[in-house]
Amino acid sequence: MKLAPAIEDFIRYKQALGNSYTTPARALKAFLRQTGDVDFDELSAHDVDAFLLGHGGRVTSAWFHRYSVLGCFFRFSTSRGYIQHRMLPSSIPEKPPRFVPYIYSTEDMRRLLGVPDSHYSPTCPLSPDTMRTLLLVLYGTGLRLGEAARLKHEEVDFRRSMLTIRETKFGKSRLVPIGRDLVSVLRLYRMRHRPRFGYERPPTVLTTRIGMMIGNDHADHQFQWLRKEAGVLRFDTARYQPRLHDFRHTFAVTRLVTWYREGKDVQRMLPLLSTYLGHCGIDETSVYLQMTRELLQEANSRFERYVFAEVDHA
């Protein structure tokens, strides 16, 4: 059995169960590109190890994601008789330290939105206006980048201040309320980007300079340029600099911090946040609780240091 048809068979099987399976499918196709469309019999443990380690050649959180995806694929292939045994490492390495996402501050946003138009290269896929609007949408809604990029005109209800999010990670649609400020941002953006006479309006709200849907890779690449231009950097030991996906983490943590400060029962509110974010279950949302408590603790510590410093100078 060749690898390519087996992978396609497996992806169709997972999608038939109601899962879009986009991210794991991308990993399997990367595995196929690396090994080529070989027979299962030609696969070796070395091929699998090389894919798991990736280009960096070291164990990261991506190693465990790839391991999980390949494990599911090999179990499926074994059940279909494509292979006799799974070709995964017998020992699991120690997990790397927990990844800590970057939480954007209002000052970070001011810097990102304040980069002058003249600093943008004409070759950038996204115009300055589109880039700023995309950042405001992500910051104000916590949407995944792909969800924001796929948002269609008919899915924006200005009267009800509501977005309809379809084609989600888990194949479920959801309604996302938005604030008045973001409604104004989107309404003005649409007015500025009305199609010229004789041209059709692009199906998606946000588009590239040539009227195409925004691709994740293009947006990520342009954001890394913008982040450096704006001086938004992290100086801790994290492997990654701030990313577009961190706006989703920022939204979740900011919402939890607000509830804590309002004296709300955060545990009872957590299912609402889980639904809003389109999570598969509450466990996925619970990871933000520890992160939020750490942020509040650090904020309290900073406040105490400030107070004591003022007393010392009195």
Name each model feature, range by range.
Residues M1-A314:
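Conserved catalytic core of the tyrosine transesterase superfamily
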